[in-house]
Amino acid sequence: MRIRKNGAEMLARAGRSSLLASVAAAALSIAPAAQAVVPNDNLSPEDIVDGTDVNGVGIMYRDDGFVCTGTLINPRTVIFAAHCVNDLSTPDYSTVNGGVPVAFAFQSDARPGLIDWISNGYRTNTALSVYNVNNIAYHPDSLDPPALSFLYGDVAMATLDTPAADVPTWTMLFSALPAPAAINETTGPGYHVTVTGYGRTGSGTTGNSVGIDFRRKTAENFLGMLGSLDDIDSFLFGAPGGYTQNLYQTDFDDPDRENPFDFNAFKDDALPNEGNTAGGDSGGPLILDQAFSEKTILGVLSGGSRYFFEQPESSYGGTSFYQPLYLFWDWIAQNNPYRYATTKAGDGKWSDADHWVTALDPNYRIIDSNGSLVNGVPTSPGAGAFGEDDAQKFGQLCYQPTDGSDNVCYDVGTDTLIVNGEPATGETQAVANAGGKTVSNNKGKVEIAERSPTAANASLNSTAQPQAEGDVSATALPDATLANGLPGASGFVPDNIDPVASQGVIGRYYDVTLSAAGTTTLDTDVTIDRFTISGGESALDITSEGSLTSEMDVAHLAGRVNVDGSLTSTGDYFLLSGLLSGSGTLRAPFLTSVMGTIAPGGVGTVGTLSVEGNAILTSGSTLHIDIGPNGASDVLAV
């Protein structure tokens, strides 16, 4: 007989009904407080402090005391969890008009940056890697009352008011991980992950017993399951709670298998640096770090569960769940304010909307038909919280208490009950009424986000203490537009727009690359985040009426740039090869020519190219000087 996918029946048929009394009756309700990465008992909180200072994972700090974690996915955008911000509307997050200021700080020890941000009127300080937020978007599904703000649709994006030019960015995986052929006793599904975040810490036994110190911590784990909260509730408590959205999930294993609260929720063994998440980690990345040649983000942290009244939060036996990015990839692409733009082949004006086309975001990843991690987007929209997710579930839910009295697992991918290591082939009689005790929808789920009980400035000067705790999978993608963020869109002009949430103005920032053959003529004032020219037959002509400002830097790798107006770069102008000419003004900290040619005025034309900054011309570069009549000549004025 086929074993029905009902955990109470599964466990009862395996001859174990006491689990329902010991676990279901002791399941805990939500606690509205926060914690951070917690190591196993073989390590101290100091041991797991991240030794890399700035790595693209940062702390989110609301000036009303809320702490979360986020990940930089481009120089302007951080991805994190909706429940960190969805208690307010987007216009409520502001440094003016009584709004709540928000910042992300990316140093491993974020305290100095956050204190500076508060002390200096909520200003970005790139030297301390702290950035003020000028807009926030969160997924509307997280506002559904049953979601309790974090159980599904828990994804958000923040826009930085200044590009984080020197902070590393992360790639995001928009494909579901493939189900393994089998679940291993030691490695589970076989996917090694890194968990990281800011906030509370402690030990495997004591849980989140140490307060937030604003330092980033990191630990390792095996991915335990791609499955829903309903899968867990059905297995442990006998009935689903109505939470069908798949989540990436991990558990916190006791390396010694002695802790009474650790019943090995997901089949795998503890790793040497095994750790669990806690509050302050909310929104932090689940990093797939060994499956491919590069690390990539699978999801953002929403929350965790504990299963006994006596069990400390974030201790051995607890589990954590992450929102899979593949379910929300199209929402992410749409709400990402950053656009990569390039030109179509042929000559055209910068101001001609038909001259431009959006390029594929270089940080978007999918798994191709060969199983390789490649730059790309899926061919159909994400299922979201309520669509039909066609991903294959994987992982085994287990009840293997430390006293050795039981060994029951359920494979969510194959719908198989496993007793003492063997698939169940028949039914055993329940010792007690299997359906007698269940857990209501939200019990056992612990929200991971922390609100400090004191003013933000005070909490930064001492250890923070917590308060009491429709099927779219087969639908074709729409036509690419600038708004939906799909590559291949046209009908726009690259020129940065700062968001104004109170007026419904959507922010847009551009990274522009000229690679196609043809000349782009700029005769207006334009500001973008970054400019690159890489095509040998590409050219940019800035007329005397034109002005280009790059908020980060300029990479002149090939092709021609003529500046008769002005070109201003916050960062350096790097001339690898190609021609830089003109009679205008170039402003940059450094103009560095490696193998390029600099021709003031232009080849065959006498003129002065002014450089407001430093100029470095290596031995491989060429300075082309024209000599005119009456002693006139080109001038490179530095």
List each model region and its residues.
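Extended amphipathic secondary-structure runs
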Residues: 138-146, 154-170, 226, 273-310, ...
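Conserved catalytic-core segment of clan PA serine endopeptidases
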Residues: 38-52, 95-185, 189, 196-201, ...
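Residues that flank catalytic or metal-binding motifs in active/ligand-binding sites
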Residues: 54-56, 66-68, 74, 100, ...
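Chymotrypsin/trypsin-fold serine protease catalytic domain
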Residues: 152-155, 161-274
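C-terminal subregion of chymotrypsin/trypsin-like serine protease catalytic domains
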Residues: 37-42, 48-50, 67, 72-86, ...
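Extracellular beta-sheet-rich ligand-binding/adhesion modules
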Residues: 343-352, 360-558, 562-565, 569-570, ...
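Protease-domain processing segments flanking chymotrypsin-fold serine proteases, especially trypsin-like
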Residues: 2-79, 87-100, 401-402, 406
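Extracellular beta-strand/loop-rich repeat segments of large surface/secreted proteins
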Residues: 576-638
